[in-house]
Each structure stands twice: as structure tokens, then as C-alpha cells.
Regions:
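A cross-family signal for key residues in well-ordered alpha-helices
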Residues: 18, 46, 113
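C-terminal regulatory/oligomerization modules of transcriptional regulators
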Residues: 1-9, 55, 117, 130-133
Length: 133
């Protein structure tokens, strides 16, 4: 029987983390699909809901970019889709014309509130029943 080295244990732990992540993301996608959202869409809505609790509050896209695992261009496209669906509103930052503000619409807040329990239930189920090795 081969003796596990520190490197092989790290590899095994890493693969376990990736496996839990993949299963969790697939399950989140599955439960959100009937609501017209995917896991990345939800993450952006969730960040906006946390960062902009009051109606009319805005968040810089740059601040969202630092918290999601998407390229700047992928995030821009995702926000464009959310805007087209009426879930967010974009505007140019007056202080820095290169910056873009994004805000949840009422429709976006309502959808986020509706699907939040679904996403949290998936996290509770997958992260407590499948710990990384």
C-alpha cells in the first residue's frame, strides 16, 4: 500500500473542495433555473442586495468584480442580461466617467428575496453533508 505524502493529501483535499464546489454550483443552477437565474446571476443579485440595502442605493461594478469569480467582460455581459431582464439598472459614475454604477430594481429585489431561501438551502445541504476531505 502506498504511503500518502503531504503533496498527495493536499491534492486529495483540493479535489474534494473542487468536487463540493462543482456539485453546489450545479445544484444552485438547477434550483434557480425555473426563476430564470443561474448561480452567477444570483451572486451578483446577492452582492447588490447586501451592498445596497435601501431603495436607490448603488454599487460600483468594480466593487462587484472583486467579489465574483468572473472576468470583467463576463461580469459586464451578465449585468447587461440582468438589466435587459429589468432586475438591475446601470448608470455612469459622474465623478469618474470610466466607472459604472449598478442598482437593484424593485423587480430585482423581489426576485432576490424569492430565491434567497432556495440558494441558502442548497448551501446548507451541500456544505454540511459534503465536507472537504
Amino acid at each position: 500500500m502506498a504511503v500518502k505524502t503531504a503533496d498527495s493529501r493536499l491534492e486529495e483535499q483540493w479535489r474534494g473542495i473542487l468536487s463540493v464546489h462543482a456539485r453546489t454550483m450545479c445544484e444552485i443552477d438547477r434550483v434557480l433555473h425555473p426563476h430564470g437565474l443561474g448561480a452567477s446571476d444570483f451572486e451578483v443579485l446577492d452582492i447588490l442586495a447586501a451592498e445596497t440595502p435601501a431603495h436607490g442605493d448603488q454599487c460600483r461594478v468594480q466593487n462587484i468584480a472583486g467579489r465574483v469569480h468572473l472576468s470583467q467582460s463576463a461580469l459586464s455581459r451578465l449585468i447587461g442580461r440582468l438589466e435587459k431582464d429589468g432586475l438591475v439598472r446601470r448608470s455612469v459614475c459622474e465623478e469618474d466617467r470610466r466607472g459604472v454604477w449598478v442598482a437593484l430594481t424593485e423587480k430585482g429585489r423581489a426576485l432576490h428575496a424569492e430565491v434567497l431561501p432556495l440558494q441558502r438551502e442548497v448551501l446548507a445541504r451541500t456544505l454540511t453533508s459534503s465536507p472537504a476531505r
